[in-house]
A protein has these predicted regions:
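Glycoside hydrolase catalytic-domain context in secreted enzymes
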Residues: 17-721, 730-744, 753-755
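Bacterial Sec-dependent N-terminal signal peptides
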Residues: 1-20
């Protein structure tokens, strides 16, 4: 009887397993994906690995109307996309820029044999800003200037909600590149030059997009950590240029943000980088995409290519003889999804049938893509319900405003700010009344969805006479005649607000000077803006510079001659209000630089965490060193740092300790400051940087208030990638530095001995 019971029990288990169906929502996403794979043909599996740009993105007239920088690329006009979707040969689309198209594409996918929904993605880099009417938050470089990861998480949550409400479920964000060359046009997409700051901001952004559990439930979407790896310090500052780096530099500088994204935030997807590292293009680098990413870091999601970068293994890198070989090598190396273009599908199917690519590799890639779709709930509701009005739009605008306020960096102030009841204000410059305030990765918005600097001043100073000269929002319109007019108007004002900088708008008809594939060999103000600034200063009236840019600009003349400088970066749709509030004293500035500002283009790459020998020699014809240091930013208040102490002066290699410092706001205003902790390893088996940021905390203090700020210092904060080619804490002398910026003059050093 006992034996019969066991047999019957086993039979019940077998029958139960046999009844399992991929439509059963009680199963895990991975279980459902595995079951669905068994019902799919090879062609349907490879179809999941194919992503195309949305048809409406490139329909006749649209590309030229938007001035789309990608519209001239090959393979955009896929005539038979509808048939491909019906055959199950498309797994995803990107740049679905209307909810109408999102619904139509998902309905089309339901006509396929298995009705597998599409994964619709978009570059929601700083808000769902490629969709008109959605919230355009400050760019990532602005957000890094806040040193406020929790605010970054909130923006991620709100962006995810707005994406869901427009039928989108996958954002190609955050950008985790470490930006160490201001010539590179994509600095504004990043969180700056530091590994820790980028790691924290990126991790919290992913938590916002995906949820803390990494399951994309509710109103969350799947995020994408990009670009793997080391594209932020390209040769010559040119996007996609080669990188030759040591494994030590890769692990200590470029990899930590991805480690945090994968191990802490459980990011669902990773995008490979345009560039090569050490002679191997990232899209064909098996060590990078498999040995490091999956085996060592434990990444369990899927890897997507960047825009047609698989083809560029042949056409740009000249690494393989043709695109067919590029497609096959990319799959062998670990790329799971191809972003945009024809011929990939046919090449991969043929490679499997010939035996070159095992079908198990296709199952791995398609299975991971399907698991994400199941986790997102797409199979339960493949066709999204689109609300007429975005939920939370007013609240999201307030978040965008607060982010803009916190990200503004005051670089200079001789007492001119905050403005003291002027009667006549002259607002001048091509960025004063322009949507350049939105930055890259944003479509033109309706005027009522954007507050420009001029709009902000009109609202903040309703009883003040405001004169303007905005040059039609075009940098190229600044000419000798306009400059002469500006000097005349400046002479009649009590104070002049000069809004200059760059233009990152990819869909603008005006000349771009910054953004993706817009790199420069000059870090001065483009066009005749420098002459404009000099003419206004020559009026003899107080002059405030508002710098609107996606990269660090070398404005040494302005530093010497302007009365005040506010680095606004690209603060988004509410930026004009935030700028006006700061300049008029309604808000106390509190942003800190997430990059080092070089003195001139000849001094890139200037970074704060350089090696001791970098400045053992000085430039012969100019001052050596940063124009402004990393972590720097002024306030209208004076913050005093005192009583910096360590809980221990000597520890073992596996021990932790605490560091603390008292911060006092000596007024005269309430304000925020960012307390920064740096560590210097004085001597080691390999040479070490002069300092490295290891912790930070944003604090708010009332006028006259004090607080004690305490940090835990763990062994992980003391370790390095030594000659043994592994992480370890090396015994010896360390210095803990506490203060308000990376400048030695703003830091208190505390010695620490590690035994």
């Amino acid at each position: 009887m006992k034996r019969i019971a066991i047999v019957l029990g086993l039979a019940a288990v077998v029958m139960s397993c046999a009844r399992k169906d991929w439509r059963d929502a009680s199963l895990t996403a991975e279980e459902r994906a595995s079951l669905l794979l068994k019902e799919m043909t090879l062609e349907e599996k490879v179809g999941q690995m194919c992503q195309y740009v949305a048809p409406c993105y490139v329909e006749p007239g649209k590309g030229s109307a938007r001035k789309n920088i990608d519209a001239t690329d090959e393979n955009l006009g896929n005539k038979d996309l509808s048939d491909k979707v019906r055959r199950g040969e498309v797994g995803a689309f990107l740049h679905v820029m209307t909810s109408t198209e999102a619904v139509a594409l998902q309905k089309l996918a339901q006509e396929s044999r298995l009705g597998i929904p599409l994964l619709l993605g978009i570059d929601a880099i700083h808000g769902n800003a490629l969709i008109e009417g959605c919230t355009v938050y400050p760019t990532n470089i602005n957000m890094a200037s806040t040193f406020n990861p929790e605010l970054m998480e909130k923006i991620g949550e709100e962006t995810a909600l707005e994406m869901r409400q427009r039928g989108l479920f996958w954002t190609f964000a955050p950008n985790l590149d470490i930006a160490r060359d201001a010539r590179w046009g994509r600095m504004g997409e990043t969180f700056g030059e530091d590994a820790l700051l980028t790691s924290e901001m990126g991790k919290y952004a992913i938590w916002g997009f995906q949820g803390r559990d990494g399951k994309y439930s509710g109103n969350h979407v799947v995020a994408c950590a990009k670009h793997l790896i080391a594209g932020g310090e390209p040769a010559g500052g040119l996007n996609a240029a080669p990188m030759d780096i040591s494994e030590r530099k890769l692990r200590e500088l470029y990899l930590p943000p991805f480690v945090a994204a994968i191990r802490d935030a459980k990011v669902g997807t990773v995008m490979a980088a345009h560039n090569e590292i050490n002679g191997i293009p990232c899209h064909g680098n098996k060590w990078l995409l498999n040995d490091l990413l999956r085996d060592e870091l434990g990444f369990d999601g899927f890897v997507v290519s960047d825009w047609m970068d698989i083809e560029r293994l042949h056409s740009m890198h000249y690494w393989v003889p043709d695109s067919t070989e590029a497609f096959v090598v990319s799959v062998e190396s670990g790329i799971d999804m191809h972003m945009q273009g024809d011929k990939y599908f046919e090449a991969v199917v043929a490679a499997v049938k010939s035996g070159r690519i095992p079908e198990s590799r296709i199952d791995q890639a398609a299975g991971k893509i399907l698991a994400v779709k199941f986790a997102l709930g797409l199979f339960e509701q493949p066709v999204p319900e689109i609300p007429e009005v975005l939920d939370g739009a007013a609240e999201h605008r307030q978040t965008a405003l607060e982010a803009a306020r916190q990200g503004l960096v005051l670089l200079k102030n001789d007492g001119t700010l905050p403005l003291k009841n002027p009667r006549r204000v002259f607002v001048v410059g091509p960025n004063a009344d322009s949507q350049t305030i939105l930055g890259d990765w944003a479509v033109p918005q309706s005027d009522d969805n954007v507050i420009t600097v001029l709009d902000g001043f009109k609202a903040a100073m309703p009883n003040v006479s405001i004169d303007t000269l905005c040059f039609g929002g075009k940098i190229s319109n600044v000419d000798a005649k306009g400059i002469q007019m500006a000097r005349f108007k400046a002479s009649a004002a009590d104070v002049n607000i000069v809004v200059v900088g760059e233009n990152s708008q990819r869909y603008s008809a005006f000349g771009r000077t910054c953004g993706e594939n817009c790199d420069r060999d000059d870090l001065s103000l483009p066009g005749m803006q420098q002459q404009l600034l000099e003419a206004v200063v020559a009026s003899g009236k107080p002059t405030v510079v508002v710098l609107m840019t996606g990269r660090a600009l070398s404005i040494g003349w302005a530093k010497e001659n302007a009365n005040a400088i506010l680095n606004a970066w690209e603060p988004g749709q509410m930026g004009g209000q935030a700028i006006a509030e700061v300049l008029t004293g309604q808000v106390n500035p509190s942003g800190k630089l997430p990059v080092t500002v070089p003195r001139n283009v000849g001094q890139v790459q200037t970074v704060y965490n350089y090696k001791h020998s970098q400045y053992s020699r000085l430039f012969a014809t100019n001052e050596t060193g940063a124009l402004w240091p990393f972590g720097y930013g002024l306030s209208y208040s004076t913050f005093e740092y005192s009583d910096a102490t360590l809980s221990k002066s000597e520890i073992g290699v596996s021990e932790s300790l605490k560091a603390s410092v008292t911060v006092t706001n000596n007024g005269p205003y309430d304000g925020d400051d960012v307390v920064q902790l740096y560590i210097r390893d004085e001597y080691g088996s390999v040479t070490r940087p002069v300092k490295e940021l290891k912790a930070f905390r944003r604090i708010s203090l009332k006028n006259g208030e004090s607080t004690k700020v305490e940090f835990d210092i763990t062994p992980e904060m003391l370790q390095c990638w030594g000659v043994s080619e592994k992480w370890s804490v090396e015994p010896g002398d360390f210095t803990i530095l506490l203060g308000s910026s990376s400048s030695d003059s703003d830091l208190t050093p505390l010695p620490l001995k590690v035994k």
